[in-house]
Amino acid sequence: MLKLTKKQLIIVLGIAIVVVSAIGYAVYTQYFNEDKLEISYTAFLESTEAGEIRTVNLSEGPKLTGVFEDGKQFITDHPRTDSLKENLLLHGIQVRETTDQYSVVQVITFVVLIGGFIGVAIFLSKKNATQTSKEYDKMSDVEFSTQKDSSIRFADIAGNQEAKENAMELVDFLKNPEKYSRYGAKMPKGVILYGSPGTGKTLLARALASEAGVEFLAVSGSDFVQVYAGLGAGRIRNLFKKAKDKGKCVIFIDEIDAIGKKRDRGGLGGSDESDRTLNALLTEMSGFKGSEGIIVMAATNRLDILDDALLRPGRFDRQIEIGLPDLKARQDILQLYTQNRPIDPKVCLRGIAQQTVYFSGAKLENLMNEAAIYAAREEADFITEGHIDKAFYTVVAGEEKKDRSNIQPIDRKITAYHEAGHAVATKLLCPQNKVTKVTIIPSTKGAGGFSMNIPPDQMYHTKNSMVNSIKVALSGRIIEEIVFGPDFVTTGASNDIQKATEILGAMIKQFGMNDEVGMINYDVLFGRQGACDQRVMELTKLNMKRLYDETKVLLEKSLNIVEAVAEDLLIKETLKEDEINEIFSGFQSM
């Protein structure tokens, strides 16, 4: 039996509708629309009087029709008078009343046409729904980058030894599941890597997949944040479906906080798209077994804002911190990034590592890349310490501005004293810190100058060190006031004031370093509302004033050193560590 496709069936139906409509029109024309003799109303009355009319059809229209005694049809004007019907009946004429003599045919034709339109509309609607469904499925299909047989290994990652050991254990889980099943141990379903940006979270996840010899499916948390309802959850389901089809693999979700934030919205609950997406992720992670060889890894810079359900056992079982590298790790990272570069043998990587406190692995890579660019510009034989030194200040403060013709002499003087104040305050208050460079050359990052203050590696910040950091931040503005007067202080201290306020606010609100507030955390008690607390505002203001006055007394006593540094800056524009130390040595010997 011949079977028609849906498209062919619709075409046949359309042709049938047209044919039926044509037949209906033909019938209508043939039987109901014969030629009628059109006569005047006067002639109609005369024929009525003469008894020549057999039948008259009365309707509501402007015309009336009828049949003569000889069978011929006629049509004439309808006078619409009340006495017309009575007059016709008195003359023995048969009267038929109808609303429309052709209504049956017209109704049939109308029904057929409407039916045809409805059929076409249904077809188009279904076709559109199918197309919409396909588009939805297409949008629900998450795109991910894959990696197999990558050259990245744990040996290519320097620092974070503890994190690497954790990752190596997961590799062993994937390669030797029997070893752990013997003891009833289950492979963690999920691992969250957290830490500062640029510390190598993605690199570690890639290395894990590479070492285990499994596929690496990488997506971003923002890929699941969509305008259309249900798309995020659909993408989660599709991702896990594809992962299961591939067998053993590593799913890596970067910036998971985009979909995994805490769902507590001030007690109001939540049912928006991000909640549905998170629920889909939680469901999928609960729905597969560790024996399937799928590990879900995620990265975030903010572990504290993730939903508790995401961090419970059975979901992301392990949380591994990827911290900023310490001195040895920085040296190892620098060694790694200089392996295939022509480095001058005189370059001391340990010295660079000591200088790059709080640099992440990515920042160290950028440092060496900038140094290589400077060497390439000069077409030098080697990347020298000078190139690395220049790259260091470019990474930290931006490149030096070439055109400085628009800088007024008074602006240079204000900048020189401002930066000299920072340098002297650092040497006096934080002797353990290194002042490696002071300059009054503007940078492309908007700084009029800067004083490079490098602290030592340390695990904690003491109250004393935080107080001294505030004083150093305030010292530039204080010197402006001492030298130029209170009415001539400038906007150059805006970043310094911001930094000092942040440190002092944290001491009072978070770290319990204020006797009046005591050992409480304002953020826990009041949330963001605590930031506007009047009491905190007053305490911050009073303590800032006290520290400002103490620093002012110190700098007034050391004004001769500040002037010496400032005068040298006005001449040389840039002072390095040995030059600054020489100025201080000269005053200490006096």
UniProtKB/Swiss-Prot annotation:
SUPFAM superfamilies linked: FtsH protease domain-like (SSF140990), P-loop containing nucleoside triphosphate hydrolases (SSF52540)
Spans traversing the lipid bilayer: 9-29, 104-124
Molecular-function GO terms, alphabetical: ATP binding; ATP hydrolysis activity; ATP-dependent peptidase activity; metalloendopeptidase activity; zinc ion binding
Leader peptide range in chain numbering: none
Biological process terms in GO annotation: protein catabolic process; proteolysis
Enzyme class, UniProt record, top EC level: hydrolase
Intracellular or extracellular location(s): Cell membrane
Active site: residue positions: 419
EC numbers for this chain: 3.4.24.-
Superkingdom: Bacteria
Extracellular-facing ranges: 30-103
Cofactor binding: number and manner: Binds 1 zinc ion per subunit.
UniProt key word Transmembrane: yes
Pfam families named among the record's database cross-references: AAA, AAA_lid_3, Peptidase_M41
Cofactor(s) listed in the protein's UniProt record: Zn(2+)
The keyword Hydrolase is annotated on this UniProt entry: yes
Cytoplasmic side: 1-8, 125-590
Residues engaged in binding ATP: 195-202
Annotated Zn(2+) binding sites: 418, 422, 496
Record's keyword terms, sorted: ATP-binding, Cell membrane, Hydrolase, Membrane, Metal-binding, Metalloprotease, Nucleotide-binding, Protease, Transmembrane, Transmembrane helix, Zinc
A GO CC term assigned to this protein in UniProt: plasma membrane
Topology of this chain in the membrane: Multi-pass membrane protein
Function: Acts as a processive, ATP-dependent zinc metallopeptidase for both cytoplasmic and membrane proteins. Plays a role in the quality control of integral membrane proteins.
Name used for this protein in its record: ATP-dependent zinc metalloprotease FtsH 1
